Protein backbone atom coordinates (compact mmCIF):
# COMPACT_ATOMS: atom_id res chain seq x y z
CA UNK A 1 0.00 0.00 0.00
CA UNK A 2 1.68 3.20 -1.17
CA UNK A 3 -0.16 5.45 1.30
CA UNK A 4 1.81 4.04 4.23
CA UNK A 5 4.62 6.43 5.21
CA UNK A 6 5.71 5.06 8.60
CA UNK A 7 4.50 3.87 11.96
CA UNK A 8 2.18 6.29 13.76
CA UNK A 9 1.35 4.37 16.93
CA UNK A 10 2.43 1.18 18.68
CA UNK A 11 0.57 -0.06 21.77
CA UNK A 12 2.17 -2.50 24.19
CA UNK A 13 0.77 -4.23 27.25
CA UNK A 14 2.56 -3.56 30.55
CA UNK A 15 2.11 -5.20 33.94
CA UNK A 16 2.47 -1.97 35.93
CA UNK A 17 1.77 1.40 34.32
CA UNK A 18 3.77 3.45 36.82
CA UNK A 19 6.84 1.21 36.48
CA UNK A 20 6.61 1.41 32.67
CA UNK A 21 6.21 5.20 32.85
CA UNK A 22 9.34 5.46 35.02
CA UNK A 23 11.31 3.55 32.37
CA UNK A 24 9.98 5.18 29.21
CA UNK A 25 9.75 8.74 30.60
CA UNK A 26 12.61 8.67 33.11
CA UNK A 27 15.19 6.37 31.52
CA UNK A 28 14.51 6.74 27.78
CA UNK A 29 13.27 10.34 27.95
CA UNK A 30 10.06 9.99 25.95
CA UNK A 31 7.52 12.79 26.30
CA UNK A 32 4.19 12.40 28.08
CA UNK A 33 1.05 12.84 26.05
CA UNK A 34 -2.47 11.92 27.10
CA UNK A 35 -2.73 9.76 30.23
CA UNK A 36 -6.06 7.98 30.60
CA UNK A 37 -6.21 7.12 34.30
CA UNK A 38 -9.50 5.19 34.13
CA UNK A 39 -8.43 2.98 31.19
CA UNK A 40 -4.81 2.78 32.50
CA UNK A 41 -3.30 3.96 29.21
CA UNK A 42 -0.52 6.50 28.62
CA UNK A 43 0.30 7.92 25.19
CA UNK A 44 3.99 8.86 24.78
CA UNK A 45 5.90 10.67 22.04
CA UNK A 46 9.57 10.47 21.07
CA UNK A 47 11.69 13.36 19.84
CA UNK A 48 8.77 15.60 18.97
CA UNK A 49 7.50 13.18 16.32
CA UNK A 50 3.83 12.63 15.58
CA UNK A 51 4.18 8.88 16.20
CA UNK A 52 3.25 7.50 19.60
CA UNK A 53 3.97 4.62 21.93
CA UNK A 54 0.94 3.65 24.02
CA UNK A 55 1.45 1.88 27.34
CA UNK A 56 -1.62 -0.19 28.25
CA UNK A 57 -1.75 -1.74 31.70
CA UNK A 58 -2.80 -5.38 31.46
CA UNK A 59 -2.95 -7.69 34.46
CA UNK A 60 -3.27 -10.84 32.33
CA UNK A 61 -0.53 -12.87 30.67
CA UNK A 62 0.89 -11.44 27.47
CA UNK A 63 3.82 -12.11 25.10
CA UNK A 64 6.74 -9.71 24.78
CA UNK A 65 6.87 -7.33 21.83
CA UNK A 66 9.73 -5.88 19.79
CA UNK A 67 9.97 -2.38 18.43
CA UNK A 68 12.73 0.01 17.41
CA UNK A 69 13.34 3.71 17.89
CA UNK A 70 15.32 5.61 15.25
CA UNK A 71 18.48 7.46 16.26
CA UNK A 72 21.64 8.71 14.53
CA UNK A 73 24.86 6.75 14.18
CA UNK A 74 26.63 9.46 16.18
CA UNK A 75 24.26 8.80 19.11
CA UNK A 76 24.43 4.97 19.23
CA UNK A 77 27.55 4.70 21.41
CA UNK A 78 26.47 7.49 23.78
CA UNK A 79 22.99 5.99 24.14
CA UNK A 80 24.47 2.60 25.04
CA UNK A 81 26.69 4.16 27.71
CA UNK A 82 23.80 6.19 29.14
CA UNK A 83 21.49 3.17 29.31
CA UNK A 84 24.19 1.09 31.05
CA UNK A 85 24.74 3.92 33.56
CA UNK A 86 21.01 3.75 34.31
CA UNK A 87 21.23 0.02 35.04
CA UNK A 88 19.92 -1.27 31.72
CA UNK A 89 21.63 -4.31 30.17
CA UNK A 90 22.58 -3.42 26.57
CA UNK A 91 23.74 -5.61 23.67
CA UNK A 92 25.67 -4.06 20.81
CA UNK A 93 26.14 -1.99 18.84
CA UNK A 94 25.60 -4.45 16.01
CA UNK A 95 26.05 -3.50 12.35
CA UNK A 96 23.40 -4.84 9.97
CA UNK A 97 25.02 -4.85 6.53
CA UNK A 98 21.77 -5.65 4.73
CA UNK A 99 19.88 -2.57 6.03
CA UNK A 100 22.47 -0.89 6.41
CA UNK A 101 22.15 0.22 10.03
CA UNK A 102 23.72 -0.02 13.48
CA UNK A 103 21.63 -1.03 16.48
CA UNK A 104 21.76 -1.59 20.20
CA UNK A 105 19.30 -3.87 21.98
CA UNK A 106 17.84 -3.83 25.48
CA UNK A 107 14.64 -4.72 27.36
CA UNK A 108 12.08 -2.72 29.27
CA UNK A 109 10.84 -3.78 32.74
CA UNK A 110 8.08 -5.92 31.17
CA UNK A 111 10.52 -7.88 28.98
CA UNK A 112 9.71 -6.16 25.68
CA UNK A 113 12.69 -6.27 23.31
CA UNK A 114 13.71 -2.72 22.37
CA UNK A 115 16.14 -1.47 19.75
CA UNK A 116 17.78 1.85 18.98
CA UNK A 117 18.48 1.75 15.25
CA UNK A 118 20.67 4.18 13.31
CA UNK A 119 20.17 3.94 9.54
CA UNK A 120 23.47 4.28 7.64
CA UNK A 121 24.13 5.64 4.15
CA UNK A 122 26.52 2.73 3.57
CA UNK A 123 28.17 -0.09 5.50
CA UNK A 124 31.30 1.22 7.27
CA UNK A 125 34.63 -0.39 6.27
CA UNK A 126 35.55 -3.30 8.52
CA UNK A 127 32.02 -3.72 9.84
Per-region residue spans from a language model:
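N-terminal beta-strand motif that seeds the catalytic metal site of vicinal oxygen chelate
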Residues: 1-18, 66-67, 120-127
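Vicinal oxygen chelate
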Residues: 3, 7-15, 45-47, 58-127
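Core segments of cupin and vicinal oxygen chelate
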Residues: 5, 11-51
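A short linear hydrophobic-aromatic micro-motif
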Residues: 31-32, 52-54, 89-93
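Residue-level structural signal for beta-strand termini and adjacent loop
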Residues: 38, 58, 117-119
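Short acidic/glycine-enriched loop/turn segments that link adjacent beta-strands
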Residues: 38-41, 63, 97-102
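Short, charged/polar, Gly/Pro-enriched secondary-structure boundary elements
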Residues: 49-53, 111-114
Amino acid sequence: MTAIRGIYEVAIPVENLERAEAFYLGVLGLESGLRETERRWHFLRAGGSAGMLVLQENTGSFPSQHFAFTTSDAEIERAGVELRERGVEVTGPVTHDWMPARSIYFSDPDGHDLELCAPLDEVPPGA
